[in-house]
């Protein structure tokens, strides 16, 4: 019996020992799944004792204690059943091959999944047009800083999945590996920050965490201004507007109104440039940098419209920083051929000073002056096509440095395999440009002028590397221009069809004609000759090709063909828009080939099968391409007009239309009816906005690092300063976060009501600011600042300085000094860690020392 008592005593002692070990572990309950930020430190209660770090009792320790106890008990020769219970018989041992299939594998992991996507309008909400971004690294760290899962986003979805996160674990998610031209996106309904905190659920649970990123060169707000060039007949010594702006949402949506005047809204323009300043232009490019917002326009040869003061090779630059045009000047003048216009553009075409008739302006069209303009993605280099010498020019936008040129390829590959050089080098005519991912895309055609064989008509797109100044050896895309495109004009009575099929270029006046029903004695006319005038890209990399009809620049509206005839001609152009699908392997499918339908509704009812003038723009993230067009309004009897159409790239439908001019009611003819009366189109998108801020948290272990499970601190006022001046303040939310955005940011109206957002005036790129937090404010009066920059990165860089506390103490204020990056460089790494003051007790035991021995 005494052994039993001793045994019970020993077992009880062991149990007490085990309980003391267990209760000695000071544990903390982590926030629930995805809500690590939703359990902030309560600022309204008494001072909080510092929360200890999580500690775990190793099962091995407890097992050792119990095992030793069992040995002791066994050594006493006692049956365990006498003390506690009768242990059941153990199950039969199973060999590997005899493991029952019905026993499921234990699932102990949870998942975090999501996408990293390109946020074109930087609103933190993903649209179905915003693609995934591949090659971004997403990593989960546990409380010890150990990687528990990592993945890299894949193309084309931008998806990642972290599959090995222990169930119930709190982790820190870091997003790294952003390319130089990619910046973290803004916070929003579909976007976290590059550092986030998640507590996963039980085994098999899945948490979703998405992140937006921004490519500043592709950013555009929802309703940017667009600009286009307009043409007026004759000498350009007038105040007629020849470059005008209009908002992206101009005009009306077909099917929503039968009032044609709805398609004229707005009828006024904020940005206008007059004819006497720039003359006739086609190519337009736009530069947006923190220092400048400027529009470039290149001189263009239209037979019935004169040049500006800079002549055939002029490139004009206009300040468009505000919503009205500023000063216009000549950036540079290229050698682009002689001006062959005469003294009178409408009737006699006489040259100066002899007064002899001029006939060679016809052939100069498409061969003199400049074609398209485009600009590098960094805004530092302007590209221009010289139609006279076939050169692609690189021009520094700041006016400094040399202007360099490279002749486009003229030894073009054969149209058919093995055909050799099917295009006479003298028939190679470049015109259109596009820029994407550092490469320049140059559009050109084989005009078949020397052979006059339509089978030789061909389109080519070559890539050019501006760094190495080399063209690719083979075209990125080429295809024959042999489609049956219907009729430029048709009617049933009398049966008439002016063919829209592309024709070889011709050096003298040539036309298909039909009597005009509206103007007796005058002739409707067309003779489509292709110029590949513009290249745009869809979000998936597919190319959109704008073809301009040379005939529309050779013949005017109700104008004679030459000084030797009184017959008046009304030109009807036969331009086109084609879609070359991305093939998924870095190439493009021929427009209209299998799997790449071309169904743009670029017609005017049954009268005209083609209405495009070739100039166009596509704003990233938008489903439409905006293209210049004659008779743009799809309503009856809206003819002899010029304007723009918005074509849906998936359906080909006309999503929107806007009329800029009508030649119907002009007392003196100034515009071009159904001819080429408009040039290129460009979007004047703003600079990508900037958002800064992020998190104040309780640094429980004092290491200056944001560890998973450490609590956020809400209710803290944060101030933004620049040059010692207060710009605004925000108050941290329950998740400890704060943010600042500029009042010009398009998302600012939706953020003004959120207390953790400070909407300020003056948050811009490449400037120095300070985040300040008064440490004496009530919300954090019992806290001190934790160690700063413990990762040895004090740059406050938005891609590298991610997880430590960045503030230093200046007096009684926590201060983070930082510089904003370029446009779109959102910075969510400006974090502040706080330590709670330890509560200290003083004193010891007071007792009556009866024997006076001090013990």
What positions do the PLM features span?
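Feature marks short, highly hydrophobic, charge-poor N-terminal signal-anchor/signal peptide-like helices
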Residues: 1-8
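Beta-strand signatures of extracellular beta-sandwich domains
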Residues: 115, 137-141, 174, 695, ...
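Alpha-helical transmembrane segments
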Residues: 12-24
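Sequence/structural signature of beta-propeller domains
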Residues: 158, 177-689
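A short, Gly/Thr-enriched small/hydrophobic beta-strand-prone motif that recurs across taxa
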Residues: 104-125, 687-705, 717, 829-831, ...
